[in-house]
Amino acid sequence: HGEAVSIGICLAFKLSNSLGFCCQDDVQRVENLFEKFHLPTSLVNFKNLSLSSKEMIERFRFDKKSKQNQLTFILNKGIGKSFIHNNINIDDLIQFLDKEL
């Protein structure tokens, strides 16, 4: 579970950066912290993952934060500056996930 949490936090920072909410330095600081404790920081660490970006998005719909088929993400404007974002363009999300897989 801890590995999934570390990957999720790193992906949230990467997505936040790709959407213009936080800087690359924050992404790097978060990744460096998790790497210091030998925790994974990306999906690339899981070569056997056979989900496409669209399949991942369908699984996101089952997350406890998602309501009425609307995806909800906790994104970041910087370290310690998280916020709820539930208006992500699906095409942007697919493009982001395709890059991360």
Please state what every model-predicted region is.
Residues 1-3, 19-24:
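Active-site metal-coordination segments of metallo-dependent hydrolases
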Residues 3-7, 11:
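Small-residue-rich helix-loop
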Residues 10-18:
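Short glycine/serine- and small hydrophobic-enriched flexible loop segments
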Residues 21-101:
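C-terminal charged capping/lid subdomain of soluble metabolic enzymes
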